Regions:
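N-terminal [4Fe-4S]-dependent radical SAM core
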Residues: 3-29, 48-88, 128
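Flexible mid-to-C-terminal extensions adjoining Fe-S/redox cofactors in radical SAM and related proteins
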Residues: 3-6, 351-445
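Short, acidic, Ser/Thr-enriched surface-loop or helix-capping motifs
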Residues: 22, 338-339
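Short, charged low-complexity linear segments at domain edges
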Residues: 63-83, 312-322, 357-387
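Conserved alpha-helical substructure of the radical SAM core
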Residues: 69-184, 189-192
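Short glycine-enriched, charge-decorated loop/helix-capping segments at active-site entrances
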Residues: 105-109, 207-215, 408
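Active-site beta-loop-alpha junctions enriched in small/polar residues
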Residues: 140-142, 174-176, 199, 242-244, ...
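Radical SAM enzyme [4Fe-4S]-AdoMet core and its adjacent flexible, acidic
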Residues: 203-222, 226-331, 337, 357
Length: 445
């Protein structure tokens, strides 16, 4: 018996150790005394109750187990089982905002009726083999092509009903057009996960996320969120906050406002991400004071802590690693981005890079893909990189947290350093204590 090579162990200030397994998602807290006893049991090959409990969560494995080979099997099974389809659809590539850090070029307009027809055929053809269909609406600003969203959504719901599919539909919108009528229309076609971005409080947000003619947007978004709060329907509404060194100090003021609006309504939540430099056509990104790679996780955890302290729900915050939890959708063989002209991409960022354009949807609703390009996105295996193969986080990303980073900049796409995960585990542990929850010696799978 031995400790799993995919364990991450983090020491807390009160002396507890947090053990987390990146393959099984098992997490437990043990005292320093228990941790020493576990090591002694393993040295003596003693099957104690605590060792048997750790075995259940994969934190302890038998000596002969090849964990990398087992991971390879599980990763391949999860990626290639083929019973799901993930489409990220751009109903238009135009936008009513001009954000300082935007990487899009707005060269294409709204999706034509012909392209809509092809997408409907695509889903109908795939449906008999599917258990699950996931559709994300992206842009540009997708609500500028509201009719396209409604038309395709009605068709997808019919297909769902005919074939008994699990169906999930979500939208990423700047929120400017998301008034009461629009919210109700989206909910009527089962678009129940909505993400809107607000980058700090009023002044900083309006400097980063303004209308095409330069107008302000913060107050309209705040009003639309208040209007959504008044609805009785079921949905999940997430406010994404992108941060840099200049707007981060204003985020607490935004959180105070959101606390006042949400009023402990658990349909609403927040999450935080650093602003990244993905290029852009106007060079505005170069005027922003971006946080360094080393500061991103500490800042994110601090903001999450501030949100939790106000009673806000944190969606997509730090979570303990698990199998493929950091894997990018672009690395999945059954995930496609569909442009407004029917072009197929793997990534929603690098639309103007040829390696990202992998094919198109043909007139019969078939996916016509360039296999060579597809292989570049989905064919890379984590055990092929000697550095990744040695990493305890390998199960969570399988060296594909960002395939674009490996393809475009030839860099290793690490989602987080192990030290950052340890910091995150300490944050989770402290959050439990701060909420009055007892951390027990237990393994949760």
């Amino acid at each position: 018996m031995k400790l799993s090579r995919f364990n991450i162990v983090s020491r807390c200030e009160d002396g507890h150790r947090i053990l987390c397994n990146a393959l099984t998602h098992a997490v437990c807290a043990v005292t320093e005394e228990d941790y020493r006893a576990i090591r002694t049991d393993l040295i003596n090959q003693r099957d104690s109750d605590r060792i048997n409990q750790l075995k259940k969560g994969g934190l302890v494995v038998e000596d002969g187990v090849d964990e990398v080979l087992r991971l390879k099997y599980l990763a391949n099974y999860a990626s290639y089982k083929g019973d799901y389809l993930d489409l990220r659809i751009l109903p238009t590539e135009q936008c009513n905002f001009r954000c300082a850090y935007c990487y899009e070029s707005f060269q294409k307009g709204e999706m034509s009726e012909e392209i809509r027809k092809r997408i409907k055929q695509l889903v109908e053809k795939k449906a008999p083999l599917l258990k699950r269909l996931s559709v994300g609406w992206f842009g540009g600003e997708p609500l500028m092509a509201y009719d396209t969203i409604m038309d395709l959504s009605h068709a997808f719901l019919e297909t769902k009903k005919t074939f008994g599919l699990q169906y999930d539909s979500h939208i990423t919108t700047n929120g400017y057009l998301l008034d009461r009528k629009m919210m109700l229309q989206l909910l009527s076609v089962d678009i129940r996960r909505i993400q809107v971005t607000i980058d700090g409080f009023r002044e900083e947000h309006d400097r980063r996320r303004k209308l095409t003619h330069g107008g302000e947007t913060f107050d309209v978004l705040a009003t639309n969120i208040k209007t959504a709060k008044e609805l009785d329907e079921k949905f999940q509404f997430t406010v994404r906050v992108n941060f840099d060194n200049d707007n981060v100090n204003g985020v607490p003021q935004l959180l105070d406002l959101l606390k006042e609006i949400f009023k402990e309504d658990r349909r609403f939540g927040v999450f935080f991400r650093p602003i990244g430099n993905f290029g852009g056509i106007n060079g505005e990104i170069n005027k922003l004071n971006l946080a360094s790679r080393e500061d991103n996780i500490p800042i994110q955890l601090t903001l999450e802590e501030q949100a939790l302290a106000r009673g806000l729900k944190v969606n997509e915050g730090f979570k303990a690693p698990s199998l493929q939890s950091y894997l990018c959708y672009a690395a999945q063989p059954n995930s496609f981005v569909v442009g407004s002209d029917g072009s197929l991409y793997k990534c929603t960022v690098y639309f103007n890079n040829d390696v990202n354009k992998i094919g198109y949807v043909d007139k019969e609703g078939n996916l016509k893909t360039n296999l060579g390009k597809m292989a570049q996105w989905v064919g890379y295996k984590g055990d092929e990189d000697p550095v990744c193969k040695r990493c305890s986080l390998l199960p969570s990303c399988y060296a594909a947290a960002c395939p674009a980073a490996r393809l475009m900049s030839k860099t290793r796409p690490c989602p987080m350093k192990v030290s950052e995960v340890k910091e995150g585990l300490r944050f989770l542990y402290n959050s439990y204590h701060d909420n009055g929850k007892e951390v027990k010696y237990d393994v949760s799978e």
